[in-house]
């Protein structure tokens, strides 16, 4: 089952890492109410951040997806408040 949630936070940075098998993994750093952390994100969200459409240290609304089948959480959308 997939559960969708939205929250407000401050975008800090996004990065891509390539694993040993050649798969690329995308993550973004977000500050939410004074707690900062790194969260997985989709390639589309990563590309949006790299294009400059999402500015560092600005506040946004993030859409997250919890996938209970795989026990994963990732950001699947970012939009202006």
Language model regions located:
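OB-fold and OB-like beta-barrel modules that bind single-stranded nucleic acids
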Residues: 6-11, 57-66
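OB-fold (S1/OB) nucleic-acid-binding surfaces
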Residues: 19-43
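Acidic, two-metal ion nucleic-acid-processing modules in DNA metabolism proteins
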Residues: 2-6, 26, 37, 60, ...
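Structural detector for short beta-strands of small beta-barrel domains
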Residues: 2-22
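A short, sequence-level motif marking secondary-structure junctions
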Residues: 42-48, 79-81
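OB-fold/S1-family single-stranded nucleic acid-binding modules
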Residues: 65-81
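Short coil/turn motifs at secondary-structure junctions
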Residues: 14, 33, 67-69
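Short nucleic-acid-contacting surface segments enriched for D/E, G, S/T with interspersed K/R
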Residues: 45-63
